[in-house]
Amino acid sequence: FQNYLSPGWQAKFFFTLKEAKRLGLGIDMTMGTGWPLGGPTITEKEAAKKYQFVDGVFTTGLTGQKVKRAAPGGEGLVLDHFDMKAFAKYSNNFVPLLKKAHSPLRAIYNDSYEAYGSNYTPDLFPAFQRLNGYDLRKHLDVLSKKKAESEEENQIFADYHRTMSTLLQRNFALPFDHWVNSMGFTSRNQAHGSPVNLLDIYAAADIPEAEF
């Protein structure tokens, strides 16, 4: 095996592009070797995160999820899709390769969200305050419940989910599409599994895609 993005891997990648062009074939590629996005360049700072309650106390940490079905050189933690800076750092790893890529490479593909248990990001509280006008930290007990017990709690749950949905759209779906286009390619996105209004996320991509 050639480790992902290694010089040997890149040599085979450019050979593949050359042969595909000779044969009249098109190529799309993912930004990784498995799903969701992530890999060896993702540190704990950029990795998917979660909140949980331990003995009634709100705590945060990593989900610990790794890239599924990763090929050699692509193993590692899953990206925090709610963090724009994390995505920017991750995508920068592909700039040198894609700047040298050429036709018939057509599209860059996000092979589904599926970041299980990722329900927190460091910008959650300030983003929640900006979007909803009140401090979620004063209502953390609501997040410890499986379901709301009042209209007020229903509203807090709704505001929390809307905030996470907004962060995913603004900090990943739209930046992914814009970045791919800026590199000269078409964006493809599988949005299923996302904790959002799926139509909004699919609309952000050039090619919205589902599994079949």
What are these regions (language model features)?
Residues 36-41, 109, 183-212:
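Hydrophobic targeting/anchoring helices
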Residues 3-160, 165-170:
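Mature extracytoplasmic enzyme cores
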